[in-house]
Amino acid sequence: AEAIYEQIKDQGEVDLLDIKKQRKKLEKEYDFYILGAWTDKTNANKDMQRFIDQQEIHGKDVALFLTCGVPREHYHADDSINNYIAFMEERNNRIHETFVCQGKVDPKVMIVFKILTWRDPNFIHKVTPDLADMVKESKKHPDPKDLKDAQNCFNNLLKHKISHALA
């Protein structure tokens, strides 16, 4: 979020909010929302979902970004962004752009996965060498390339929106 903010902050009135600290409805409404979250159970995390509903972000123009513990090419990343999109569309929001990149996996998640794998060898997130490798790789993300790609994505989107608004 900070990297995107640094890239776009001079393109208009832009605010960076810490949603964990935002417990009441903002007095200010925005023309456009860029909403970023980390993945939890193939969707935006509960803090972001609560924020969206608390702030009544319904029927708005939005762009979404999401970090996911797996590489972008993994089906879990697609499922996660698609569920986030569906969550937003259920609230009649218009989605102009999405961005997904790999992000860190909380070590506590792996502990839970190991316990659940021990209990049920068919557990959907069974701890395998491949999963362990993905989690190890996730510690490096978002990396400088991920951050630059996110900056470019939203910078280009806003430049396009501004140029069309002025035309």
Explain the meaning of each model-derived region.
Residues E2-I4:
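Short amphipathic alpha-helix
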Residues Q7-D15, F32-L35, D40-A167:
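FMN-binding flavodoxin-like domain, especially the glycine-rich phosphate-binding loop
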Residues Q22-E29:
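Short amphipathic alpha-helix with an adjacent loop that forms part of the alpha/beta core around
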